[in-house]
Amino acid sequence: MENEIFTPLLEQFMTSPLVTWVKTFGPLAAGNGTNLDEYVALVDGVFLNQVMLQINPKLESQRVNKKVNNDASLRMHNLSILVRQIKFYYQETLQQLIMMSLPNVLIIGKNPFSEQGTEEVKKLLLLLLGCAVQCQKKEEFIERIQGLDFDTKAAVAAHIQEVTHNQENVFDLQWMEVTDMSQEDIEPLLKNMALHLKRLIDERDEHSETIIELSEERDGLHFLPHASSSAQSPCGSPGMKRTESRQHLSVELADAKAKIRRLRQELEEKTEQLLDCKQELEQMEIELKRLQQENMNLLSDARSARMYRDELDALREKAVRVDKLESEVSRYKERLHDIEFYKARVEELKEDNQVLLETKTMLEDQLEGTRARSDKLHELEKENLQLKAKLHDMEMERDMDRKKIEELMEENMTLEMAQKQSMDESLHLGWELEQISRTSELSEAPQKSLGHEVNELTSSRLLKLEMENQSLTKTVEELRTTVDSVEGNASKILKMEKENQRLSKKVEILENEIVQEKQSLQNCQNLSKDLMKEKAQLEKTIETLRENSERQIKILEQENEHLNQTVSSLRQRSQISAEARVKDIEKENKILHESIKETSSKLSKIEFEKRQIKKELEHYKEKGERAEELENELHHLEKENELLQKKITNLKITCEKIEALEQENSELERENRKLKKTLDSFKNLTFQLESLEKENSQLDEENLELRRNVESLKCASMKMAQLQLENKELESEKEQLKKGLELLKASFKKTERLEVSYQGLDIENQRLQKTLENSNKKIQQLESELQDLEMENQTLQKNLEELKISSKRLEQLEKENKSLEQETSQLEKDKKQLEKENKRLRQQAEIKDTTLEENNVKIGNLEKENKTLSKEIGIYKESCVRLKELEKENKELVKRATIDIKTLVTLREDLVSEKLKTQQMNNDLEKLTHELEKIGLNKERLLHDEQSTDDSRYKLLESKLESTLKKSLEIKEEKIAALEARLEESTNYNQQLRQELKTVKKNYEALKQRQDEERMVQSSPPISGEDNKWERESQETTRELLKVKDRLIEVERNNATLQAEKQALKTQLKQLETQNNNLQAQILALQRQTVSLQEQNTTLQTQNAKLQVENSTLNSQSTSLMNQNAQLLIQQSSLENENESVIKEREDLKSLYDSLIKDHEKLELLHERQASEYESLISKHGTLKSAHKNLEVEHRDLEDRYNQLLKQKGQLEDLEKMLKVEQEKMLLENKNHETVAAEYKKLCGENDRLNHTYSQLLKETEVLQTDHKNLKSLLNNSKLEQTRLEAEFSKLKEQYQQLDITSTKLNNQCELLSQLKGNLEEENRHLLDQIQTLMLQNRTLLEQNMESKDLFHVEQRQYIDKLNELRRQKEKLEEKIMDQYKFYDPSPPRRRGNWITLKMRKLIKSKKDINRERQKSLTLTPTRSDSSEGFLQLPHQDSQDSSSVGSNSLEDGQTLGTKKSSMVALKRLPFLRNRPKDKDKMKACYRRSMSMNDLVQSMVLAGQWTGSTENLEVPDDISTGKRRKELGAMAFSTTAINFSTVNSSAGFRSKQLVNNKDTTSFEDISPQGVSDDSSTGSRVHASRPASLDSGRTSTSNSNNNASLHEVKAGAVNNQSRPQSHSSGEFSLLHDHEAWSSSGSSPIQYLKRQTRSSPVLQHKISETLESRHHKIKTGSPGSEVVTLQQFLEESNKLTSVQIKSSSQENLLDEVMKSLSVSSDFLGKDKPVSCGLARSVSGKTPGDFYDRRTTKPEFLRPGPRKTEDTYFISSAGKPTPGTQGKIKLVKESSLSRQSKDSNPYATLPRASSVISTAEGTTRRTSIHDFLTKDSRLPISVDSPPAAADSNTTAASNVDKVQESRNSKSRSREQQSS
């Protein structure tokens, strides 16, 4: 029975399209297997697993049981693996959810041969098909599908759509990733989701019910064994167990009975169903046969239809050909126009021929002209004869002229000789004049050099001032122009806008014209090509004509030459005779006639040749035309060839696109099936319409906004420019008031930050622009692709038709071009491929037609449901029409937008240029503000003016600018006037000095005469009575002589100093020249840098302006986006409202659902009741049925009996026969009954077996449920772990990113540090090189110092010899002095001295006034530091002390020192590069002022030296003494040396004598000086070594300032420097000696001094004892201070002092201090007080004091001065000491003779090595001092024995050792 039912199902299933598709993967059964074998192979799952492997080869290989042998469990296992793999593939790779119920593996495994089984297998195959179609190898599988029959293909396509597009079966998860989905797309998705949810809930409920039932059954089964076990247990009572078991058995019996009843009913129903099915089957078979016949008919119809289709295609091709032929006809018609053009061209050529004929006529005319010329030749011959006569006359005149020229040449030679003689004489005279001038210039040289220098300085200063004035005027003019331009810009912008509008209209017109002109251009180009060819041909013809004409010209020239020859021969013959002439003429005439004939024949030949050439020309033209035609054809062919190639490429592209189209077609088919999606798309269209309308409106609004923005921007740019100017002014003023110098750094940082921010904005803007451009491009690409696809779909057929026509053309062209044949063959192949593809497309179209028909049926059904939607579709169609119109409008708007954008670009460029101008204005304004600050604008007023309006501010600024400019000009004019006044004063002063020198020389000569006279008097015998008088007179005369000598010495010193100054100025000139050259080079480099920086600045400014403009555009875009966002927010709010309403509906539905559940429960209860009633009714029905059957049987029996009785009545025989028949029937019925009984037994057995299998299945389900629960728990755990791991992974990812960021930061820092390290290393190397050079210089200076000391010793010996000679002379002169003493008047030199001092006071007073004015102007300018001053003081010379005048060795050392130090100064020049230009200007000012300061200092020195002689007369003249003290103090104050010793000249020389001469004892020195030492107890040896005079620190300016302040302090405290007022005084300072860096070490100096003289040792011991004593008494609680602390304190002091003072202020302060000190000295005449000061951290002398670690030394305060008082008796000198004084004076005279040597008065090394860079240089000095290993000498008090040399030497050695050990320890610490 089952086989009979299943076989037709199986046959249907195996012929189904899904199975046929699966068979494409391979044979199902080996060999010729039956359908059953193939079905079994399918159901077993092995084959299907293999198919899945082919689809997804990446699958994990799971064990598949290949030998199933009809085992249900193995089958289920295989199929479950398959189902799992399919589910995994859909979810993971395809991102799809299987919504349809998965194929039931149980049914397939246990009941494969049933309808349910086949349906489940169908599901499996469907899912497999979905996998195959969407996998990576889908192309192969689709090709296999295409290889199938048409019907199967169509069915498979339908199945594919079921799987892929029907969301009820498979749900796509990719929409989850899409963020921007419209509402219309979301709505159908939500509906589907709701349906799916409902279905899932229903399934869940069903499954839960089944689970409950199964669990109850399981509990029932478990209950029996449990009961039996409880029965066995002895605990329970037996009575209870029996009752329970009985109840349980009764329940089970009832259940069993109910089941039996159900089974019986089912059996009966099934039998009835079977009968019904048989009947239906028969009907179905009939219908099948009918359908098969119909199918056959349809197939025959389809074949005929295909035939008709082929014919249709042929007709279509013919139609296409007709179209193409028509197009060709149109082309030929177009060519007709070309023919007309060619006709016109022929006419033109004819005209050209006419022109050529005209040229021919012209040539003939020319020939006639030549004939006329030949006639004229005779006339010309006559004229020639006349000209020859004239020539003869001219030659005569020429000869006369030659003679005259020769005469003139002779005269010229004589004059030249005379000139040479006069030149020689003049040269000789010039040479003599030069010699004379040289002699005169030797005396006037210094004056000229000074005058020149001052003139140059003034002229350079004037030039610079003029340049500055010009630049300022230019800036003012520029500002005014910019203001005017800014005012005019507004009107310009309005005009520009109008012009822009007008231009935009013009542009539109021009664009149309351009299109027309392009077309005309193309025509012109074609014409030009033709014309070019014709031109080339014509040029060839013209060349040939030229050649012919040249030949003719040559022939004519030859004829002319021949004629000329004949003319010449005629002339010759004219000399002979007339008869011969006539004959010759006749002959020549004949020759001429012949030549004319020849020429005429030649001309005729030429004409003939011309005609031939013309013919040839015409022939060639015809050929040219043909060639042109051929070329045109070639061009056409080439174009066609190119077109064909393009078409081929297009076809290839289309082939590629066809595949994409197929996919799109499949998608379109799916869309066709679903009308909802079409409606959604219509909704989208409406949405797009609305969006486009909005966009159009937005574009219009944006255009309007842009125009408004442009206008507002223009206004804003004006306002912004003004506001920016004001803001920048305000900010600069505030920051300058707050910070000053720090503003520059801050502004630099700000600019850098702004640049960075601008760069960031740049990058962001670029990125945004790129994104916008990309999005626009993508949109355009998508639109173009859509249009292309539509166009390609339309043009595919046209292309095919064109290809066919082109193929025919190619066949025609094959003969001419072999290359084209290959291309045609390729095209034919392509054509075949295309035809195949066409066929395939047709088939697909047929499939589509079938699908469309199905869709139409569905659409018909849907249309009934959705009539309202159809109305909406109509509305949407109208909107589509609107859309098209809007698109057109949009295109127009886009065009307008492009024009607007162009205008915007131009406006942006204008904006950029305007912004650049404003920025330039800002820069100029900033410069002006800086200059205003320098000039001294009152900033408080400006701050008050901030509150006023913009106009008033602007006016105020203009007025202030003008006033400040005027002020600056006035100040500059005053400065120039002051400089000129100084010049005049200096020149007058020089003249006065020279006059004084002359008078001194005269006095000196007079004195010499007097001495000679005295000698004469001494030779006569002296009178004994007048001895005392003579002695007194001699004393007076000696005094006067000494005064005169001192005066002479001073004059000579002045002379020497002037010479030294001259040399120093020369060296300074050279240095300045070199510096100037270097500075010029630096300026050029800086100018280049500034130019490059300006260019960069301009580029940056342009970029900045562009960015600002772009930023404004982006802002406008952002505003539009914000508007859109607002609209979206409104939409969102509406959606939220809708959502709320939906939620409410949902809640209502929930409540309904709850009520329904309750109703359902009630119904279930009713159902149970009805079930029980139904069972009872069934039982009743059964009994009634059995009774009915019995009654029927009885009824039949009765009928039979009745019939029998009737028949018995009729025919007894018939009854007998009937009985026999009945007996046979009874037998058959018995047999049937037996068979029925047997069948009943079988059914019982089957029932038992089924019950058994059912119980087994229940057990298996229980096991599976437990497994399922376990798996569920495992799954939950794994999910939890997965979430945890994902969280950890995200954390780790974040950490990794942070680490990445930190690593990049660290890398950047490392790179920066490495760069810094490299820079520091380079700087260190540079510093090391500088240190090395300085060390080398130091060594050279030490060597020079040693040499100078040796020279000093030699000179000392010479001076001693001279002293002895002078003593002898003095003894001789004493006698003469006695005689002439009465007539000697000593007052004039004093008066001269006073006159000089008065002049000095006037000069200083005038300078004070000038300096005060300068202070006012300079204090307002902010000084960076005094480094520039320090640098400019390089050539500044130290004034020499009075104590070191005669020592030549010192000056020798100094000259060498100046050379080296000048080199150092030049090396240190590069640090000037980094300074601004204003500082350079300031430097120039300082340099000029310094040169004048040097002059003043030299004058001051002269005054000091005059003071030494005139103070011998202490009680006589007080005023002169005061003045000289002032000048002496000034000499000390101008020096940069802090420790400068103030010994008298005589005292110093006496010391030198004592030190160097061994014969003199300690008694030779004045005892008064010793007593002074003992009384004060504070005398120190203060003589300098050779190089100590040059000991100066790096910060000379600060020292000068400090010294000035301290001089003031000293004056207030009634303390002054001790001067050498008397010959017997030794005023020694308390300070130590200062050891300079260029000089020898103090230890070497001490050693030398101690070795040379024991007296000096004695003095040292005494001074040290006195000092030690004083320190102990004075400061018992003093501290030891480190050098670094001391330096830091000093730097703090000096930095404060430097800011308030300039170089010119020094003189004012010096003069004030001098005036105070002079007053004080005038009051305290008898007692001379010495002030010894030590400035903190200024000199190495101070370091000498402070480095010692002994506690006895004082810690000097940073602002206090160390003052020690030296009191000396001012009494008259004793007779014992007078001799010594005389000796000293004589020695000074002898030494003075050697002051004229060149080394004597050179500037010191320290004067040149006055370094620059105040604050920065201090630190470098500090570093140098800390690195210096040399320690100062800590001098201990020596033992009592003063004469011992050994103790001093040992002390010095110990100090040397201690210093070495300390230096080593320091080096170790530093390392």
UniProtKB/Swiss-Prot annotation:
Residue ranges of coiled coil: 196-425, 458-1385
Outcome following mutation: residue 1675 to A: Phosphorylation-deficient mutant which disrupts binding to GNAI3 and GNAS
Cellular localisation: Cell membrane; Cytoplasm, Cytosol; Cytoplasmic vesicle; Cell projection, Lamellipodium
Entry-annotated residues carrying Phosphotyrosine: 1765, 1799
Post-translational modification: Phosphorylation is induced by epidermal growth factor (EGF) in a phosphoinositide 3-kinase (PI3K)-dependent manner. Phosphorylation by AKT1/PKB is necessary for delocalization from the cell membrane and for cell migration. Phosphorylated on tyrosine residues which promotes binding to phosphatidylinositol 3-kinase (PI3K) regulatory subunit PIK3R1/p85a and enhances PI3K activity. Tyrosine-phosphorylated by both receptor and non-receptor tyrosine kinases in vitro. Tyrosine phosphorylation is required for AKT1-dependent phosphorylation of Ser-1417.
Membrane topology: Peripheral membrane protein
Keywords of the record: Cell membrane, Cell projection, Cilium biogenesis/degradation, Coiled coil, Cytoplasm, Cytoplasmic vesicle, Cytoskeleton, Epilepsy, Guanine-nucleotide releasing factor, Intellectual disability, Membrane, Neurodegeneration, Neurogenesis, Phosphoprotein
Main function: Bifunctional modulator of guanine nucleotide-binding proteins (G proteins). Acts as a non-receptor guanine nucleotide exchange factor which binds to and activates guanine nucleotide-binding protein G(i) alpha subunits. Also acts as a guanine nucleotide dissociation inhibitor for guanine nucleotide-binding protein G(s) subunit alpha GNAS. Essential for cell migration. Interacts in complex with G(i) alpha subunits with the EGFR receptor, retaining EGFR at the cell membrane following ligand stimulation and promoting EGFR signaling which triggers cell migration.
Name of the molecule in the record: Girdin
